[in-house]
Design a protein with these regions (language model features):
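The serine-hydrolase catalytic nucleophile loop
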Residues: 1, 121-122
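Short beta-strand/loop motif that positions the catalytic acidic residue
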Residues: 104, 110-112, 116
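Serine-hydrolase catalytic machinery in alpha/beta-hydrolase-like enzymes
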Residues: 1-53, 147-155
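Primarily recognizes the serine-hydrolase "nucleophile elbow" in alpha/beta-hydrolase
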Residues: 38-106
Length: 175
């Protein structure tokens, strides 16, 4: 999967599960809890001393990392990579979740599927990324929110492994 492919590329990956998931809940609860989790995880990663720390999160995890980075004090990371950033709830582009993104000082990589309902219309994400200090998008042609492509049968681990080189290149570019 994704973490194994990062490790094969010479990067260290520290995986975690948010407490609400550990508790068996479907809904995340207060964002403050997720922000505290990100702070604890990045502190643990820094203690390992394996080079710069880059926060990488899927969907909600990425959005929470971006919110933690935008706060004062920001998240102590060299950069942030988002896999399927949830720009807005599906079908509700009038409710964007972007107001904090320009406050993120670190480089940001948005890995997004062109068929992801969380980023339609695509121009809305492009505008949000243009408002950021240092950010870019890596589009996955035909990819949905979990990067699945209609008509192409791929296991989640295979999809994750295919995304890792994009993130590895980003990390090497900021390290």
């Amino acid at each position: 999967g994704f973490a194994a492919a990062l490790q094969a590329a010479g990067l260290h990956a520290l995986r975690f599960t948010f407490p609400y998931i550990e508790a068996g809940r479907r809904m995340p609860g207060p964002a403050a809890h997720a922000l505290l989790t990100w702070r604890a995880v990045t502190a643990a990663a820094r203690q390992r001393g394996n080079g710069p720390v880059v926060a990488c999160g899927k969907s909600y995890g990425g959005r929470m990392a971006s919110m933690a980075a935008a706060e004062e004090p920001g998240l102590d990371v060299a950069g942030l990579a988002y896999l399927g950033y949830p720009l807005h709830p599906p079908g509700k582009p009038e409710k964007p979740r972007i107001e904090h993104l320009p406050a993120v000082a670190q480089p940001q990589l948005f890995v997004e599927g062109t068929n992801d309902p969380f980023v339609q219309p695509l121009a809305q994400l492009e505008e949000a990324v243009a408002s950021c200090q240092s950010a870019r998008i890596a589009w996955i042609d035909g990819g949905g929110h979990s990067f699945e492509v209609k008509g192409r049968k791929q296991a989640p681990a295979e999809i994750g492994a295919s995304l890792a080189p994009l993130v590895a290149e980003f990390v090497r570019g900021i390290a």
